[in-house]
């Protein structure tokens, strides 16, 4: 072998090694889908598939202005119980698995608001008690009102 042939063989080996390293790292980042074997998913598709598997499918349509009863799972020691929280939905945010609602109620004369992630495992159930008729997407003006002024008209068509 001449010096020139050694250089070309070494450069070919380096190229093959670099390709093998790139392929091995790509194999680590690419994850196959359970639903379709031997199909590689992009990271975005993988995230969407995971989120779809985590979403609750039994949720009713919830609108701003509705009075809802949310069953919240509470762990106390080794016991678990469901505590109801009832109030008016004053805001809806985000979408998909990140969807949240803000529920407001008056407790002992003080306004209390809680934000619930709809697809969270901590939310056991959501039941719409009453449909509300409103003309706003966010009902933050209810924070400044007191007594009967905080009531929302009932909607009968939904």
Swiss-Prot record:
<dbReference type="InterPro" id="IPR018257">
    <property type="entry name" value="Ribosomal_bL19_CS"/>
</dbReference>
<dbReference type="Pfam" id="PF01245">
    <property type="entry name" value="Ribosomal_L19"/>
</dbReference>
<feature type="region of interest" description="Disordered">
    <location>
        <begin position="1"/>
        <end position="35"/>
    </location>
</feature>
<comment type="function">
    <text>This protein is located at the 30S-50S ribosomal subunit interface and may play a role in the structure and function of the aminoacyl-tRNA binding site.</text>
</comment>
<feature type="compositionally biased region" description="Polar residues">
    <location>
        <begin position="16"/>
        <end position="35"/>
    </location>
</feature>
<dbReference type="InterPro" id="IPR038657">
    <property type="entry name" value="Ribosomal_bL19_sf"/>
</dbReference>
<dbReference type="InterPro" id="IPR008991">
    <property type="entry name" value="Translation_prot_SH3-like_sf"/>
</dbReference>
<comment type="similarity">
    <text>Belongs to the bacterial ribosomal protein bL19 family.</text>
</comment>
<dbReference type="InterPro" id="IPR001857">
    <property type="entry name" value="Ribosomal_bL19"/>
</dbReference>
<protein>
    <recommendedName>
        <fullName>Large ribosomal subunit protein bL19</fullName>
    </recommendedName>
</protein>
<dbReference type="GO" id="GO:0022625">
    <property type="term" value="C:cytosolic large ribosomal subunit"/>
</dbReference>
<keyword id="KW-0689">Ribosomal protein</keyword>
<dbReference type="GO" id="GO:0003735">
    <property type="term" value="F:structural constituent of ribosome"/>
</dbReference>
<dbReference type="GO" id="GO:0006412">
    <property type="term" value="P:translation"/>
</dbReference>
<keyword id="KW-0687">Ribonucleoprotein</keyword>
